[in-house]
Amino acid sequence: MERVNDASCGPSGCYTYQVSRHSTEMLHNLNQQRKNGGRFCDVLLRVGDESFPAHRAVLAACSEYFESVFSAQLGDGGAADGGPADVGGATAAPGGGAGGSRELEMHTISSKVFGDILDFAYTSRIVVRLESFPELMTAAKFLLMRSVIEICQEVIKQSNVQILVPPARADIMLFRPPGTSDLGFPLDMTNGAALAANSNGIAGSMQPEEEAARAAGAAIAGQASLPVLPGVDRLPMVAGPLSPQLLTSPFPSVASSAPPLTGKRGRGRPRKANLLDSMFGSPGGLREAGILPCGLCGKVFTDANRLRQHEAQHGVTSLQLGYIDLPPPRLGENGLPISEDPDGPRKRSRTRKQVACEICGKIFRDVYHLNRHKLSHSGEKPYSCPVCGLRFKRKDRMSYHVRSHDGSVGKPYICQSCGKGFSRPDHLNGHIKQVHTSERPHKCQTCNASFATRDRLRSHLACHEDKVPCQVCGKYLRAAYMADHLKKHSEGPSNFCSICNRGFSSASYLKVHVKTHHGVPLPQVSRHQEPILNGGAAFHCARTYGNKEGQKCSHQDPIESSDSYGDLSDASDLKTPEKQSANGSFSCDMAVPKNKMESDGEKKYPCPECGSFFRSKSYLNKHIQKVHVRALGGPLGDLGPALGSPFSPQQNMSLLESFGFQIVQSAFASSLVDPEVDQQPMGPEGK
């Protein structure tokens, strides 16, 4: 149970709560009523020798077919007075069920398959058996249970076993009145509509007006047809699976006497194919009529291009299955294939040609995204910033970066929760999902970890991959990082230090190297000398990285240099192990590029004691506290260095003024560094 915000409550002070398991518990209770003698069930479904009590509301909610049947019964006069009703192929009889409920008798479907479908309606779980899969798929299409249809399609995609299409027997009506003889030809089950011939087996193409009239009077018509659901404005071609029996017509006389598919066509509307010509005839007649069934699922197409696109979703072609030979596409005057689908001019296909990467096999919807993806394999960065020269793989990234130089990149998108600004709305949405929302819809199938965005989940999945060794250096890495690692071996270093000309594989390593080895200030100078900018020879200090036995450069003064400057770099926390050159000697070059001088010139905070410059005021305060305050005693006298306080001298003075000298002295007396200070009595001058 959780509380939700409801804007309809207003300021009246009402509360809204939502119980997420309420719907599950209701279906569970209804299922228990159905199994316990059919309590409160109002319909009895007879399948063969078995009977299944059920609730009309549940059946109508999960099946559009049952909704149409029950709606027709409510509108029928015979259903109102308790008499028998024949609604579009489903026989409803009074009595005989639990609580005097009506009965529906079903044919040509096994009780096991219908029991699985009925259990799915109450439990949302279904058992798919490969031996009865064609019958299950046919029944799901007829009942218009979209969830079961999607499950069947998913089974076809994931199963490595070739599943046979349903035979012609399964295509006949599943629900029909008792006593009605089986028809000798298959019906169209698409959208719950069935095209049936009369008792003599004669059927022809109907005009749209006749189709609408038949759909309106399907419930009261004398023909043995299924109810036509509202909203079906046309009866399509045979969309159900075709069996081998269709290849030979059971009515040769009718097939031979059928009129040919030739005639005058209107200027704007394509010709309408004859139904008998499409359903009956020899294999050659089917191809000439444009009937092209799919070899896996049995779906029928009238255009070879549509069939090829459909078979691409299965991963096979009709030629590989040996089901039917596809005719070559007809070409027009402009050289393009002509679509023979009656719906072609009115409804365009949404199927796009997908392209795959030759290196990694990733599939993209068009060539543009494929070419952009190939840049990740080549490492090419064709777009460079005209200001700083930084290169990018994509032009939009480069354009966005250029705006950062002139300050035009603002942050107009403000988070209403924390006030943080963002330059792009997608960045704001990602921030809200990640920080201010507890919902984590994307879950990992391995460790059950949940994430707010799909990108975070994709990055997390890399941790579950097994590490593989590099073929060059033998280093073990995950497959997601192996491509970037191999670039280091194939391309070599691409970022070189402008001072020592050392190469690095990435710009981040180069920045660490410059800060660590070349970002050290000069030795201390006297107050009377003019301050020297920290850039002439920034790395000439008392550090001994890279040289043997603590040796220094020959032009450095060993006397005036101070060891206290070894840790006073602007990046004092960045330390690297000792580096040696190839021949073991420490080389030094006094030539410093101009850009290095300009970057060091940005140090605009000079030390008033020694004249050294620093990039930030915090580095200057650290320098004064570590060097000048400790060396000269500072404003606190002998107590300043003894306290070892982490505060600045100004903060220490404020503490002394606030709490009094006696309190501070007694609090820090035990932490004095000099043991002689502990033994000396505090004189009056100390107070």
From Swiss-Prot:
Any single GO CC term annotated in Swiss-Prot or TrEMBL for this entry: nucleoplasm
Occurrences of domain BTB (ranges): 41-130
Keyword Nucleus: yes
GN (gene name): PATZ1
Keywords: Chromosomal rearrangement, DNA-binding, Isopeptide bond, Metal-binding, Nucleus, Phosphoprotein, Proto-oncogene, Repeat, Repressor, Transcription, Transcription regulation, Ubl conjugation, Zinc, Zinc-finger
Protein known as: POZ-, AT hook-, and zinc finger-containing protein 1
DNA-binding region: 264-276
Superkingdom per UniProt: Eukaryota
MF (Gene Ontology): chromatin binding; DNA binding; DNA-binding transcription repressor activity, RNA polymerase II-specific; RNA polymerase II cis-regulatory region sequence-specific DNA binding; ubiquitin protein ligase binding; zinc ion binding
InterPro entries to which the protein is assigned, alphabetical: BTB/POZ_dom (IPR000210), HMGI/Y_DNA-bd_CS (IPR000637), SKP1/BTB/POZ_sf (IPR011333), Znf_C2H2_sf (IPR036236), Znf_C2H2_type (IPR013087)
Keyword 4Fe-4S set for record: no
Species, as recorded: Homo sapiens
Zinc finger (C2H2-type) stretch: 292-314, 355-377, 383-405, 413-436, 442-464, 495-518, 605-628
Subcellular location: Nucleus
Comp. bias regions, Basic and acidic residues: 549-558
Role noted for this protein: Transcriptional regulator that plays a role in many biological processes such as embryogenesis, senescence, T-cell development or neurogenesis. Interacts with the TP53 protein to control genes that are important in proliferation and in the DNA-damage response. Mechanistically, the interaction inhibits the DNA binding and transcriptional activity of TP53/p53. Part of the transcriptional network modulating regulatory T-cell development and controls the generation of the regulatory T-cell pool under homeostatic conditions.
